[in-house]
From Swiss-Prot:
Cellular component terms per the entry's GO annotation: cytosol
HAMAP family: RimP (MF_01077)
Function: Required for maturation of 30S ribosomal subunits.
Family per similarity comment: Belongs to the RimP family.
Source organism, top-level taxon: Bacteria
Name of the protein in question: Ribosome maturation factor RimP
Upper classification of the organism: Bacteria, Bacillati, Bacillota, Clostridia, Eubacteriales
Presence of the UniProt keyword Cytoplasm in the record: yes
Organism in which the protein naturally occurs: Clostridium perfringens (strain SM101 / Type A)
């Protein structure tokens, strides 16, 4: 099974349980690091901070279900956490949600001589995002984005 399909299947299995426990699933990823596999789920609660106890509640519920369903054939570690203040932006839904906020975008390759941009997310369009940086609007094609993060406000 392809990784993208596995992640989609895992999201379909996990999202209802996360929701049942009173949280929203922000993002899910299945990665291999140093010869170990990790299933990482990032949860949130609108207008509330996520505590260690929140992560524990969701982790236990997911662990029980994943043991029964057994969707992952490899040995792996389950990690549940908050996306954090400087959360990664993965989808149009994430970008749209944070219009008007400060973001940092790293590029896959140079864009107008720049490797990245930090500024206010102004708009999200089908193939690009628009970031205002130092009074200029910079159009960033989505296929040029390597990473995008919200710049946290404390």
């Amino acid at each position: 099974m392809k990784k993208e399909q596995l992640v989609a299947d895992l999201e379909a299995l996990c999202a209802p349980i996360v929701k049942e426990k009173g949280y929203d699933l922000y993002h899910i990823e299945y990665v291999k690091e140093n010869n170990e596999y990790y299933l990482r789920l990032y949860i949130e609660k609108p207008e509330e901070r996520i505590s260690l106890r929140d992560c524990e509640i969701v982790s236990r519920a997911l662990s029980d279900m994943l043991d029964i369903e057994d969707p992952i054939k490899d040995a792996y570690f389950l990690e549940v956490s908050s996306p954090g203040l400087n959360r990664r932006l993965h989808s149009d839904e994430h970008f749209n949600r944070f219009i008007g906020k400060e973001i940092f975008v790293g590029f896959k390759s140079s864009l107008s001589g720049r490797k990245n941009v930090k500024g206010i997310l102004k708009d999200v369009q089908e193939n690009e995002i628009i970031v205002e940086c130092e009074g200029n609007e910079i159009k960033v094609p989505k296929d040029k984005i390597k990473t995008a993060n919200l710049e946290g406000e404390i």
